[in-house]
Amino acid sequence: FLSLIPHAINAISAIADHF
């Protein structure tokens, strides 16, 4: 589960960068 956290943060960062 912890290994998914960096991926989630990266996805959120990508979405935030898109907006």
Swiss-Prot record:
Coiled coil: none
Keywords: Amidation, Amphibian defense peptide, Antimicrobial, Secreted
Subcellular location(s) per record: Secreted
A cellular-component GO term for this protein: extracellular region
Signal peptide: none
Major site of localization recorded for this protein: secreted
Tissue: Expressed by the skin glands.
Modified positions (Phenylalanine amide) in chain numbering: F19
UniProt keyword annotation of Secreted present: yes
Domain of life: Eukaryota
Gene Ontology biological process: defense response
Family of the protein in this entry: Belongs to the frog skin active peptide (FSAP) family. Phylloseptin subfamily.
Role: Has antimicrobial activity.
Protein name: Phylloseptin-J2
Native species: Phasmahyla jandaia
